[in-house]
């Protein structure tokens, strides 16, 4: 009978994976076991720390529901979400860069006509957003589905409010024949990611703040083009260099320009990458 110890256990576990039928699953699981065991050996993980880690992951799962995804939030603050985006979504020069998806997108956002008020009662300073969707060749992309969502002036997304029965600060539009779209909303503000759960505990334990710089989320889809998931960040925000989820890219920083009537205006164009 084979006995296992700290010197031969990793090899034995990997050997058990030898008959995994899917090659990619085999590759991922083999690497995961190897790195996980190496991590435990490197830090000399104690049994109490192992139990604490199990409890932490359990609590993270218990925090998830149809309105909040604590595991995505955990992935975000560990930089894993952004690393995955950066590795898998390299774009040709000139294309709008992607960034993290975030935990507060929901299906079924209302559809709006150009110029409509997407804020729909959300608290904040009024703002107009003007955009254009093109391909890398500069040609307009007509009929692109442009979905946007954002937090309000208090740093909350609509889904974080108990009992709120209408969508606020989120909506879907379609670009016109010239690729253009515009809508009313509120000025983006910096806000803290939810820190009342396990992710917040981790941030406090490591001396990190929970703040994200002000931004608007966009997801843009069009036939013949790769789906773009990105943000537009507000220039001058003090958290641009310390985003809690590592999502800022210089090319995604935009200008919210104050108008003579006291409202604001953001102009930002999006360039999609064609599918092969």
From Swiss-Prot:
Pathway: Aromatic compound metabolism; Xenobiotic degradation. It comes from the Bacteria. SUPFAM superfamilies: Aromatic compound dioxygenase. The keyword Iron applies. Belongs to the intradiol ring-cleavage dioxygenase family. One of its GO terms (biological process) is catabolic process. One of its GO terms (molecular function) is catechol 1,2-dioxygenase activity. Involved in the degradation of 2,4,6-trichlorophenol (2,4,6-TCP). May catalyze the oxidation of 6-chlorohydroxyquinol (6-CHQ) to 2-chloromaleylacetate (2-CMA). This is 6-chlorohydroxyquinol 1,2-dioxygenase. Fe cation binds at residues 157, 191, 215, 217. Induction: Induced by 2,4,6-TCP and subject to catabolic repression by glutamate. It comes from Cupriavidus pinatubonensis (strain JMP 134 / LMG 1197) (Cupriavidus necator (strain JMP 134)). Its cofactor is Fe(3+). Its EC number is 1.13.11.-. Keywords: Aromatic hydrocarbons catabolism, Dioxygenase, Iron, Metal-binding, Oxidoreductase. The gene is tcpC. Binds 1 Fe(3+) ion per subunit. It is an enzyme of class 1 (oxidoreductase).
